[in-house]
Structures are given as C-alpha cells and as structure tokens.
Regions:
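Terminal targeting segments of Actinobacterial cell-envelope proteins
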Residues: 1-39
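Sec-dependent N-terminal signal peptides
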Residues: 38-52
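Boundary/entry segment of secreted carbohydrate-active catalytic domains
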Residues: 25, 29-31, 48-49, 53-115
Length: 277
C-alpha cells in the first residue's frame, strides 16, 4: 500500500521528475542501441545465419481484396502450438550494404521513416532488393509521441507510396519511447496512428516494441498483430505482454543484426499485409 505524502506538492513533483528521468534513459538507450548495431555490423562483416529455422519456399501468390482479411490471431496460436517458425530480419540505414540476395531470411522488414520528416537513406535500396528477392517484405515507422500521430502516419505513407507496392507488404509502427508523455497519452497516440494507417490503406498495421514497453503502453492494442523484442527468451518462446493473446513476430537477438522468428508461415504473414499492389 502506498504511503501518503506529508507534503502535498512532493508527490506530483517526484512523479514528474521520475517520468523525465525514465524518458531520458529510454532515449539514451535507443541511441546506444543504434550505435552498437552499426558497430556490430561492421565488426561482424556478414550476418551469422547458422541455426536459423528452415521454412517452406515462398510462392508469391496474389492475395484477395482488403475486405477478405484473414483472421489474425487463430493462425498465430496454431503455428505457435505446432512449433513452426519462419526466420526473418529487420534492417535500417545502419546496415546499408546488407546483401539480401545472399540472405536466408524468409521475411525482411526495413525502416522507412521516423517522426514527421526523417526518411531512412537506405529504404529505397532495401525495398527494391526485397522486391527482387520475392520474400515477404515490410516497412516500419519509428514513432515519437510528442508529435501529431496523424502527421507522422501521413509522412510514413507518403514515403511508402513513393515506392512500388506488392501484395503482402507489411506495415509496422515501431514505438519505443514516450517523449515525456504519460502512459495514457502514449497509448492514445499509438491507437490514433494505427487506426489512421488502417483507414488509409485497408491494412491492419503491426505493432513493434520491447516487451516491457509494450506491457506498459500497449493495452487495448490487441487487434494489431504484435512484433515483440525480448532478448532473454529463446526464439519463439516469448509470452505476449499486455492484453495480446499471442505474438506474431519475436525479435530474439540484435547480434550481429536484428533477427526474428514468426509464428506464421510466409504466406500467412502476407495475409496480414497489403491485399493489392
């Protein structure tokens, strides 16, 4: 039980200070993570793909119209129970020279945008190479809750729509920082961004975050497929946070590059993406 403060002003000031400190630590961690990813990629030279899950060959079959969207979570739960995992990577401009043609990945998700004006310099190249390879591809936006969510969503869509689209392309919100906003504000921001992209595209976007962040700020987002980072869990063994009943993608390591497994097959992943080009 929480003790009552003797000073009525102490508790709100302490809470504000704690939130500010937490946000600064989150931002610092994000910057350190990005720097370490670049260093690890340079040192490693090539991505270590030994021990990755093998999956069926991707067919690239065209999909149905947006109205015929497949149920999202039952296939996920079935795949998890069956133990089937599909291996994939996520890439940004910190790995600008990554060679997709020599990759064992069955899906690739790449950074497109951040905030209201940043465009990843390597997005177009990665997007084109993934299209040529023919595996499932997706694009993600790194969100900043201090900004207008609709403005950020529109920035993401404008960059995404500047490139050729294919059926099965995945859309993702990457949310890892609060920018000093409250839990309810961050949660509302995410709901607005996701709903806007869904309305504009007919695609239910995926939500990405670390497990702890998603568990705190992700309540009420269970309609959006979950991509969760949890490095202390073996690949495919993570439990869903907040009120998600299942996960769709588990990012299980960031060494020497971000590596993931999906509980879905490649074709099932495509069902979550664009239904038409």
């Amino acid at each position: 039980m929480e003790a009552r403060s003797q000073c009525p002003m102490l508790k709100p000031r302490l809470a504000a200070f704690t939130q500010t400190l937490t946000d600064r630590l989150d931002l610092l961690k994000h910057r350190i993570d990005l720097s370490s990813k670049r260093l690890r990629f340079v040192v490693a030279g090539t991505v270590l793909l030994a021990g990755t899950a093998s999956v069926a060959t991707v067919t690239g079959t065209a999909l149905a119209a947006p109205a015929a969207h497949a149920p999202e979570h039952p296939p996920v739960q079935e795949a998890q129970q069956a133990g089937a995992l599909t291996y994939g990577l996520d890439i940004s401009n910190y790995e600008p020279l990554y060679d997709w043609s020599d990759s064992q990945a069955q899906f690739g998700i790449i950074k497109a945008t951040e905030g209201t004006d940043f465009r990843d310099a390597s997005f177009a190249r990665h997007w084109h190479e993934l299209g040529q390879k023919g595996i499932v591809r997706g694009a993600y936006h790194y969100g900043h809750p201090a900004n207008d969510p609709v403005a950020e969503a529109e920035h993401f869509l404008s960059v995404l729509n500047s490139q050729p689209a294919k059926p099965g392309d995945l859309l993702v919100l990457d949310l890892e920082t609060t920018d000093g906003q409250s839990v309810s504000a961050v949660n509302s921001w995410a709901k607005t961004w996701l709903a806007h992209v869904k309305e504009r595209t007919g695609v239910t976007p995926m939500f990405y975050s670390g497990w702890n962040f998603a568990n705190t700020y992700g309540h009420g987002l269970a309609e959006y497929p979950l991509w969760v980072a949890h490095y202390s869990k073996d690949k495919g063994t993570v439990s869903p946070p907040a009120d998600w009943k299942s996960w769709t993608i588990h990012q299980y390591t960031d060494y020497p590059i971000d590596q993931n497994v999906s509980a879905l097959s490649a074709d099932q992943l495509r069902d979550l993406g664009r239904q038409t080009a």
